[in-house]
Regions:
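Phosphate/diphosphate-binding loops
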Residues: 1-69, 74-77
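Conserved small/polar residues in nucleotide/adenosyl-binding loops
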Residues: 179-180
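Long, low-complexity, intrinsically disordered polar/charged segments
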Residues: 1-5, 10, 166-176
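Active-site phosphate/pyrophosphate-binding segments
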Residues: 44-175
């Protein structure tokens, strides 16, 4: 069982880890805090080493947890011969380009500020996505609520026609994720 926790002290996660231990189930902790309870009690530990979290939205920890899970998935795929060593290396190489891509986004302050100024008075913001994009929509909506205190919800794109669309009115911002 893989247990992911920023602090390594999350009560529900610790309880799950201890239940696994009682039942002789191997555990891997993915944690940020060295020496935390989960780090000490898990059979193996993968440290994200994101450093202290300043933001209430825990953006650094979340990002490093995703990367840790991705790298672990790559290793599983390689061991199971689902991908070759070369493919794995290519995926890791692409992953290493993320810091530069993040830097470019953050440097585009004028466009970000312009957009934010146009949308800051939105009463509601809906994030829409399908499959993996829905997961990203859930996290995007949570981050928006935690940081801006604007009401936000995430919906699976396929559910839009089942009532959700009736919630969209003038002044509602809709963020659609179409990565896949």
């Amino acid at each position: 069982v893989i247990i992911i926790s920023q602090s390594g002290e999350t009560a529900d996660s610790l309880a799950a880890l201890r239940l696994c231990k009682e039942n002789n189930i191997r555990t891997l902790g993915i944690v940020n805090v060295v020496g935390s309870s989960i780090a000490r009690e898990a059979d193996k530990v993968f440290y994200t080493l994101a450093g202290p979290e300043i933001s209430v939205a825990t953006t650094k920890a979340y990002s490093t947890q995703l990367i840790a899970a991705y790298v672990l998935a790559l290793q599983f795929a390689k061991i199971r011969s689902e991908i070759t060593e070369e493919q794995c290396d290519a995926y890791v190489k692409e992953l290493k380009t993320l810091p530069e891509k993040i830097k470019r986004i953050l440097e585009d302050k004028e466009r970000l500020q312009w957009f934010a100024s146009k949308q800051a008075n939105a009463k509601d913001i809906f994030f829409i996505g399908r499959n993996l994009d829905y997961s990203m929509s859930l996290e995007g909506s949570l981050k928006l609520k935690e940081i801006s205190y604007i009401h936000s919800e995430a919906y699976a794109a396929g559910e839009l026609k089942h009532g959700t669309i009736s919630l969209i009115e003038d002044g509602t911002l809709v963020v659609l994720s179409l990565i896949h």
